[in-house]
């Protein structure tokens, strides 16, 4: 799997390519291990430079991990590790609220929307759920919720709790009009998701027309798409038989299936869906979650059979134990238990925080643990030169799949865990996904033959022989400083260039990156710098060979052979020629040249610079030259950039060979500036505008572009810093929040006036929009209930 800026091969997946490099490389040092602190009077303190830098690093790291999870479908850290980062971020914000921006990860749900799919706005926000990782935390949460219910004063003895399995899949929002399925979207950031309608239509059990009657004229149905465990195993067996790499795990496979560009490919995947709630609706009144499940089933929608309405904490704990004992024998993977207040009136009274409902929680099971032998500890060199040790183990089945490798992060982690080569170790899958070595079984250490031995971190890069050193004084990470010429770093950068968040070159995958930079033959690889990527020719690839493991009836034999990668083998009757994938590679390379500026910035592998910062930079400066020439202060002033990213940009452009990449790409036709219409007035300079609902004359992207080219910021969330909210048809919770905060609300005519002539011209429209509130602008039935995505 891969972190957004960096790549890692999935540690539990047999790639059948011998490279010796499979573990992780991350750009930013984890901020784990920081304890929480009370925030009573701390909000009055002025943050020091160190606190501000830690905060900015945390924000960027959380964003990177979200990108890896939601867009790459490839998390690199466990849920628990992510939560530790997130809680540290929340602690700093509680102590220093002046640091909090409205686009902070703590104010958002989920991830950004991929540019590969059309963006669509949910009629009502899709919330996430608060996670707890121990029974003690769960008991505390329920006690707090029951105390809040008691304060409502409605005479209720205590809430009934709908308790159900938390499916490990991808949250999806279905939109039905007059009973007909018209749209399907991913959760995205909770407000806006990706349009995956054509792919969802391939899931046979999702009705395209609801059965029965009494369904609302318009209704959002929320649920989870997943792949059943047995079907996943059978699908992987078929892939192996066909000589293809198996999929890593059911959750990533489901998410990746829904993001296929070709629905015919999605149709081959054994996808299923369970629905668990309703978002926006017109004219439907259900009184409880369990009542809603009954109604959804009557309409022909697939609901989970694994739920119960329970009346006490003891019953909930019994439910958790019962399914915990058999979670790996269920029909599908789960990553916990969801507990919700069943009654909708009580849910509405309890309300929401900025991210999660106060009436629902997700309990995460502790990871399953097994024993296996640690055969060796090797190291991987990542995209930024970070050298990461990883354990090579006797393959063992854990949490539903066979694992043979696990990251050990850095040499300090190896020492802290106390593991030695040859030990019997405790292995688990953190979050039931990421393989993790917990520690040694000390009682068995003296019985090992040969005797165990200490791991010694290499002093030279295993890929290029350069002496290794810490990136900076006191840094626990050891790095290879030979960024330009190290073939391992180049391999990772080339793979990153092709990633979905950068140039999106589907034909340049992990194995292709190896073939281009570290082939078995020829001695001089086709690529010695990413600068020459767009100068590759078919002739350059004709003699490339890689080492690939032989298979017998789909089973790896342990023997390797040299095979051509980019060309067919060729026979006397059929000469060798470029494969279809190779032809696709050249087509996609040509197409990549016209990608927008922000994608080019992501492709450059500049530390800390992900899609969000790249978009902000492209919007603010418009061209690569302008970004290169900007001062550090000018860069830091851009909303969404800040001093850490600004310093990283200046440091990157200071290197001659970095500038050579940009210059060479530009010579080869890569787009280095976004088209700017100089005749468009900058009427929205310094303004933040939020668009919600459907506008007759603008698509969502057109409205956003209209704001950006006039100097404004198009935001996805409403806060006290929002200048205007533009409300179209089916405006959702953003309109409610705007009214609560007193933010001016514009209709479409007011929006056009704002675009044309600025704030003064829109004032009358805002007043008129406010006067129209009683006429039903943005009205919704009282019983609208926003369903969190599980």
Swiss-Prot record:
The keyword Amino-acid biosynthesis does not apply. Residues 679-768 form the BRCT domain. It is an enzyme of class 6 (ligase). Its cofactor is Mg(2+); Mn(2+). CDD domains: LIGANc (cd00114). GO terms for molecular function: DNA ligase (NAD+) activity; metal ion binding. GO terms for cellular component: cytosol. One of its GO terms (biological process) is DNA replication. It catalyses: NAD(+) + (deoxyribonucleotide)n-3'-hydroxyl + 5'-phospho-(deoxyribonucleotide)m = (deoxyribonucleotide)n+m + AMP + beta-nicotinamide D-nucleotide. This is DNA ligase. It comes from Arthrobacter sp. (strain FB24).
